[in-house]
From Swiss-Prot:
Disulfide bond is among the record's keywords: no
SUPFAM superfamilies linked: Amidase signature (AS) enzymes
Originating species: Helicobacter pylori (strain Shi470)
Active site: K53, S128, S152
Keywords: ATP-binding, Ligase, Nucleotide-binding, Protein biosynthesis
Protein name, UniProt field: Glutamyl-tRNA(Gln) amidotransferase subunit A
Job of this protein: Allows the formation of correctly charged Gln-tRNA(Gln) through the transamidation of misacylated Glu-tRNA(Gln) in organisms which lack glutaminyl-tRNA synthetase. The reaction takes place in the presence of glutamine and ATP through an activated gamma-phospho-Glu-tRNA(Gln).
Pfam family, one: Amidase
Length: 453
């Protein structure tokens, strides 16, 4: 597939040809990365075609978060990131499959069915932005937008062999993103390489008065300032690596060796056990999800139950029929931790611990430029691999720290395992220092020159 950098130099006629080619490929593909062929969404604005995750509003398109409860909902306005794409010679072209309401790590909970990993169709593409990553890796998209609440851009990028960037919280507007966990959610790019990630990030970043959590900063110019000659002081967290598979640990050590040979300084640091981060993340995210999803009641928009007797039954049946099992589980647990008698014991303590984790990151960043970790404990696993929801939650162990602290992080493919599946590693940077993330990743990408096809 042509890169985003290359596509931006095409004429309008050449772009129309490219869109027709992508549409034909999607129709012929069995990956189920797109919810439907891009042309079926209606007319697309002029510009380089960018695949959009199904929780980002595109005016006139049916946007469902891959959930039955939003069946038939037509977005009445553009998300701010879509407006930003239009201002930078790009446009939405198709909606990607995802875990329902972004609650999952495998893209198995979508009401549209599973998405397959293009590297091995018997394996998951990761999630929740699995459709976006599978499409980019499978040659079905030039680039894509995803959202990252606990690793939902970085983990599928790692599983599929793409570059995935979670920007600093507040760097990219969330206006028009259908919320899962408002204090964690962030929109970001999934691309074929670091240059494309930089270009797409620059296009969507910047202050937005319609988002009260948007940082009052100008759009970034990371692509213009990309510098692979810069050298950094990079921290590693040895205690956190024990949960990774042997092959991920080997890829980690080999990448560390490459970073040292490139002239970067590696130092060891310590943090609170990452298992605590899992508990904190899920308490807070489920609490916020139970609040955010209360609006889907069958009255205002989306699916409405039929043959009901009264308003109470309308609420009950609409939500029971519309939400999938994982979403129901998180709503119930979220209501539990917010209930009288448990708010102080769980939610309040989790928020206090979240602040402590953020302070730990800030302390480390007083002495280093970047932190280097795996993205996931393993490479992409088979479908129906997790015996319990808890096992799936533990797969986020390396990614959720950046969300808890609002820091930017980037996933880069660095190796292949014994089955030829991609393995990604992650850099985390100080708040609003995406430039350093992209600089070090750009240099490492050039150094490793990994061939996945």
């Amino acid at each position: 597939m042509i890169t985003l950098k290359q596509a931006l130099s095409l004429s309008q006629d050449e772009l129309e040809t490219l869109k027709n080619e992508i549409d034909a490929k999607v129709r012929a593909s069995d990956l189920n990365a797109y919810i439907k062929a891009p042309s079926l969404n209606g007319a697309s604005a002029k510009g380089v075609p960018i695949l959009i995750k199904d929780n980002i509003s595109v005016k006139g398109w049916e946007v469902t978060c891959s959930s039955k409860i939003l069946e038939g909902y037509i977005a009445p306005y553009h998300a701010s990131v879509i407006e930003n794409l239009h201002q930078n010679s790009m446009a939405g072209f198709g909606l990607s499959n995802m875990d329902e309401f972004a609650m999952g790590s495998t893209t198995e909970s979508s009401c549209y069915g599973i998405t397959k990993n293009p590297r091995d169709k018997n394996r998951v593409p990761g999630g929740s932005s699995g459709g976006s990553a599978a499409a980019v890796a499978g040659g079905l998209a030039v680039a894509a937008l995803g959202s990252d609440t606990g690793g939902s851009i970085r983990q599928p990028a790692s599983y599929c062999g793409c570059v995935g960037l979670k920007p600093t919280y507040g760097r990219v507007s969330r206006y028009g993103l259908i919320a899962y966990c408002s204090s964690f959610d962030q929109i970001g790019p999934i691309t074929q390489n670091v240059e494309d990630a930089s270009i797409l990030f620059d296009a969507i970043s910047g202050h937005d008065s319609k988002d009260s959590t948007s940082a009052n900063l100008k759009p970034t110019q990371t692509f213009k300032n990309l510098n692979r000659e810069k050298r950094f002081k990079i921290a590693i967290l040895r205690d956190h690596i024990k949960d990774a598979s042997n092959e991920v640990q080997l890829a980690y050590e080999n990448t560390l060796k490459a970073l040292k040979e490139m002239g970067h300084e590696i130092v060891e640091k310590k943090m609170l056990d990452s298992h605590y981060q899992i508990s904190i993340y899920y308490i807070i995210s489920m609490a916020e999800a139970s609040s955010n999803l209360a609006r889907f009641d069958g009255v205002r928009y989306g699916r409405r139950a039929q043959n009901i007797k009264d308003l109470k039954e309308l609420y009950l049946k609409s939500r029971s029929e519309g939400f999938g099992d994982e979403v129901k589980r998180r709503i119930m647990l979220g209501n539990f931790v917010l209930s009288s008698g448990y708010y102080d014991a769980y939610y309040l303590k989790a928020q206090q611990m979240r602040l402590m984790i953020k302070e730990q990151y800030n302390k480390i960043f007083e002495e280093v430029d970047l932190i280097f970790t795996p993205v996931a404990p393993t490479s992409a696993h088979l479908f129906n691999y997790h015996a319990s929801p808890l096992e799936m939650y533990l797969s986020d162990i390396y990614t959720i720290g950046a969300n808890l602290s609002g820091l930017p992080a980037l996933s880069l493919p660095v190796a292949k395992d014994s089955l030829g599946l991609p393995i990604g590693m992650q850099f985390i940077a100080k708040a609003f220092d995406e430039q350093s993330l992209l600089d070090v990743s750009y240099a490492l990408e050039q150094e490793l020159d990994l061939k996945l096809d």
